[in-house]
Each structure stands twice: as structure tokens, then as C-alpha cells.
Amino acid sequence: MEKVKVQDAVGMVLCHDITEIVPGVFKGAAFRKGHIIEEKDIEKLLDIGKENIFVWDLLDGYVHENDAAYRMVKAAVGEGIALTEPKEGKINFLAKFPGVLKINLEALYEINADEQICFATIHGNKTVTEGKLLGGTRVIPLVVKEEVLASFEETCRKNGPIIQVVPLKKAKIGIVTTGSEILNKRITDKFGPVLRAKAEELGAVVVGQSFSGDDKNVIRDQILKFIEEGVDLVEVSGGMSVDPDDMTPAAIRDCGGEVVTYGAPVLPGSMFMLSYVKGIPVVGLPGCVMAAKRTVYDLVVPRLLTGEKLTRRDFVLLAHGGQCQNCERCVYPDCGFGQ
């Protein structure tokens, strides 16, 4: 840092905010810390009484914080991310459209191992709305060495985007509703309306709902019928416990395909099941999905609707943060559930 006359400061980096006060009209920063002094700034600085200022000289091999931020977002940001203009060297990330936020955690940790880098995000694998603040980046010093940025860019080249929003598909969903009491109209189906509302929330559409009773073969055949009709997801509601009449898990297994999990370390929603039949996800939904505001459904189904292929490992990772706190006022996804 050095003190120089404003006439000699062109091309140098301002070390501090410079305040301008116009009584009754304006009080604020005329120039922000990190601003690179231009020829046109000299008269303005003199007008507000600044004949000398503290600056950094931008030496060869160093990059100004604003330019560094632009380079970092170019290297690290994937689809679905809108950027703010740099302010004091920081650029924020906003969601361009509704979708599921994906963060490459290992790469995120690797780039932040350098103490001159700040790249912060909210938790990933959650639904976000258009305009949602997702994170931001900056370098810590006003100027940073070129090799620091080169290392950052190389990490991004090796790992792909650090942050991106994957859009939700305009998915077609088929619902198979189990339970003899519903088939025989002893009670009104309350699961279907809940699932339709959740589908609408995710931009999907329920193209059909069938009622199977508790016959394993009927449940199986109705699942396969929806798949043959070209749905993107089959949701089987109810029949997921160990009661003798609960046949959903056996029916899903009888469809063939790959069972990913029967059981999830999530409360509510531990009796959840996921299988892929002819490449189409089939989920078995426990009764809590109908009764509770947020459940395992909200942690898993949005990811399925982006086309992500889930594994048992994905479910294991839900354990940390898998307990919903049943808050009186639900603010999901802006809470710790699923994080």
C-alpha cells in the first residue's frame, strides 16, 4: 500500500472506499475499495477533496479481485446459474430457473483449501426456485497471484462444474393406489390428492391413477402398465409396512429390474422403496408421505425428476440430516432436513 497523488494513480487499485457527501442529496461510496483508477476519475476525486489516495500498484503476475471473480465463475459455474455484477470483488450465484441444486463437494473442498479463495454455497441436492441465492465467490486479497487462479481453473477442468442447477423434467407420473379399503370404497382416497399436489409443485403431471387393492399381482400389473404407457415415474402409495396385507414391496420386486433400496435412514419416511424397472423409477411410498408436510419423498423424488440415477449410497448419505424436526412453521427446503 502506498500514498500517491491522484494524478499519478491511474491504473492502480484503490485500497479503501472513498465517501462522497452531498448534503440532503447523497451520502455513500463514490469509489469502492478495489476500484481501478481511470483517467476520468481524477476530476471527480479532486472535486470531493482527494488530492492523495492509498493504492495498490497492480504488478505483473497479479490479478485484480473483480477480474479474479470473473475467471473463477467462468471456470466453476455450470448450467442454471445467473450471476450478479461484482461488488467489492464478490459475485453471487442465483438460480436461473426452478430445479435441483448440485454441488461437487470434493472439488468445492479442494478449491477452498487455498486460503486466498472463498467459494461458498448453500447445501446441494435440494430444490431451488428461480432467483434463489445459491452462493458466491471472491478472492480474499485485493489482488491475487496468477498461479492461484490457474490452480483453481485446473481443479475445475478436472472435476467439471462446482455448482449447477439441473432443471426438473416435465415428468409424467402414474399412481398405483393400494388398499382394499380404498378399492372397495370403504374410505376415501386421501393419498392421491397429496401426490397430485406434490407433482404440481415439481412441475410434473399425474397422467393416471389406478386402484389395485391388496392383490400383489394386480399391483405388479398396474405398475407395468404405466411403464408401458411411457410414464417417467411410478408412485405406489401405501402397503409398505410388515402387515400381512401390505404387498407393495413384493409387487415391486416381481416387476423385475433393479431394487436400489427398501428402507431409508430418513424420518419420516423410513419404509421408502426405490426400484428401476426397464429404466423407469418405481417408488413405494409409506403412509407418512400422505400425513406429514415433508418426508423422504421431498428429498428423493425431485432428484429422480431431473433424471439422476440414485444408488444405495445416495440413501446412506441422507442419514446425516435425515430427521425432520416437524417445525410448527415449515420452511423446507430452507432448513436442515436432508442436509
Residue ranges and their predicted role:
Residues 1-149:
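Phosphate-interaction motifs
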Residues 105-106, 146-149, 187-188, 245-248, ...:
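Short acidic, glycine/serine/threonine-rich loops at helix termini
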Residues 143-169:
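Short N-terminal or domain-adjacent regulatory/targeting segments
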Residues 7-11, 29, 83-86, 126-128, ...:
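Solvent-exposed alpha-helices and their adjacent loops that cap or buttress functional pockets
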Residues 77-79, 119-122, 156-163, 222:
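Glycine-rich, charged/polar anion/phosphate-binding loops
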Residues 159-214, 218:
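Glycine-rich phosphate/diphosphate-binding loop of Rossmann-like nucleotide-binding domains
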Residues 180, 207-338:
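Short glycine/threonine-rich loop/turn motifs
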Residues 51-54, 81-83, 90-92, 132-133, ...:
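Structural motif
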